[in-house]
Amino acid sequence: MTDGPTFLPPPPPLSDRWALFLDVDGTLVPFADDPAQVYVSPRVISRLASLATAMDGALALISGRQVEVLDRLFAPLRLASAGLHGLQRRRAGEPLAVPPPPTGTLQQVKQEALALAAGWPGALVEDKGEAVALHWRAMPEAAPVLQAFAAVAVTRLPGYQLQPGDMVVELRPGQVDKGTAIEAFLGEAPFHGRFPVFVGDDLTDEHGFRVVEERGGLGVLVGDRTPTVARARLPDVAAVHAWLGAGD
């Protein structure tokens, strides 16, 4: 594990022989106080379409967002995608399997979280269907309260776990993560047998870095978070765009 990402080299130039996996928030788009307010530029969408074609479809989005939300953000593209940290997964051009509806307890937790966040203007509860995320980017002072709530709430949800992130904590089903999603894609065409590369910024992306590195591929960290198992680094979203060929 690398302790000093500032000294990691940049990734090599893109190759159409790769299997390319891309995180979204903090990688392809900057973080926003409200996740619903992010915007993907037409230039990035156009470049991803070109790359997916050049790679024979071996390009996938790996995100904590729902796949349905990714489709709206990157419209008209419908790329291979994993959502909710691997709970959802869809091959390019195929329908998304519909997961079972949330439990009554999860719905109750969501309502309690909304009531709690209402007392902290700027705190945000993001309903992800089978998961729920508590954000405090616009209200950092709410972090201890939201984290404490999440720590208790997860004990009421059998099979769920806490997933900390960048100014967010998420309650989501366990047994899956971004690494398991990437691993599943790598077992299928058109990803199978290719050099795997995963680009991401957050703590949740370490699962994906670990999988591609164990398979002889490359993890690319965006930013300067430490420690990391990634072996290459890009400093920010603008650098990711430039590396992809979608820069200004």
Model-predicted segments: where are they?
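Mg2+-dependent phosphoryl-transfer enzymes with acidic/Ser/Thr/Gly-rich catalytic loops
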Residues: 2-5, 15, 41, 174, ...
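Asp-based phosphoryl-transfer active-site loop
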Residues: 11-33, 61, 182
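Active-site phosphate-binding/coordination module
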Residues: 39-126
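Substrate-recognition "cap/lid" segment bordering the active-site pocket of phosphatases
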Residues: 82-111, 163-193
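Short amphipathic alpha-helices in soluble, non-transmembrane regions
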Residues: 109-113, 145-155
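Short beta-strand
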Residues: 123-127, 161-164
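A generic structural motif
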Residues: 130-136, 168-172
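Histidine/lysine/aspartate-rich catalytic loop segments that bind and position anionic ligands
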Residues: 150-169
